[in-house]
Amino acid sequence: VYGLWYGNNYGSIITYYALTRVLESLNYTYAMIRNPLGREIDIDALNRSHPLKFARDRYEVTPLLPINRLSELNNNFSAFVLGSDQMWNYNLSRPYGQSYFFDFVADDKVKIAYATSFGKDKYIGPEDEKIRTDRNLHRFDGISVRDDFSQRICKDEFGISAELLSDPVFLCPVEKYNELIAEASDFKVEGDYIFAYILDPNEKIGASIQKIAEETQKKVIVVFNESGDKESFKERLKISSELVSYELVPTVNEWLY
């Protein structure tokens, strides 16, 4: 499985957790392909990173291979699955070359994209990259996307009829999420509350949060991504309401709670 399972976005983490639970329910064995632009992780970094701790406890992970050696994985696997999220957003995929389009996967291996996305409502890569993308997309055995604009891009730009399928989080049985929540047994929030998970904090979002808190008279718990300057994020929201509090670095289980 190739994708953003190791990132600091809680939603991405849960997306790949859900995908792997579904694969297991179908009796497939799998491994997660390690970020080829990453580095070996020392124990201190592992203990600081919720995504990596979450992965360590739940996934088989491939050895760290640079992009020019990813083809070695063909020796170990019969099929490759590209996960959900904005894997085909050129702004995100550019550092990875064509690896997000499985250029390293041999012709005789099964290649599947599940609920992938271009992240934009139009293709934004340069023409030479589009030519390579077209060639590699036509090598896939199955392509599905999670949004209608990605489906349209596949059709209009590359002549591919992609299936429109839901994100893996909607395939995974709710019992699997309850198991994760049960592991957050020490994390409790008393009373009713509103949960706000903010990826790109700004004053407009902060004003909306404050308005909702004051109109409902419910407390709001705000969470940001694990990485980044949390104090700077709070300043960008410019929230003054005492009803709003911040849970700065919850575990994956606590976030799901």
Please provide the spans of the model-predicted regions:
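A nucleotide-sugar donor-handling region in carbohydrate enzymes
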Residues: 70-71, 94, 115-199
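A short helix->loop->beta-strand "cap" motif at the edges of active sites that frequently abuts
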Residues: 107-110, 140-141, 160, 218
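Short acidic alpha-helix that forms the nucleotide-activated donor recognition element
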Residues: 252-257
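Hydrophobic/aromatic beta-strand patches that form the interior of the parallel beta-sheet core
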Residues: 31-33, 81, 112-114, 144, ...
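Conserved alpha-helical elements of sugar-nucleotide-dependent glycosyltransferases
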Residues: 11-18, 150, 204-208
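Catalytic donor nucleotide-activated moiety binding site of glycosyltransferases and closely related
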Residues: 113-120, 151-154, 198, 205-251
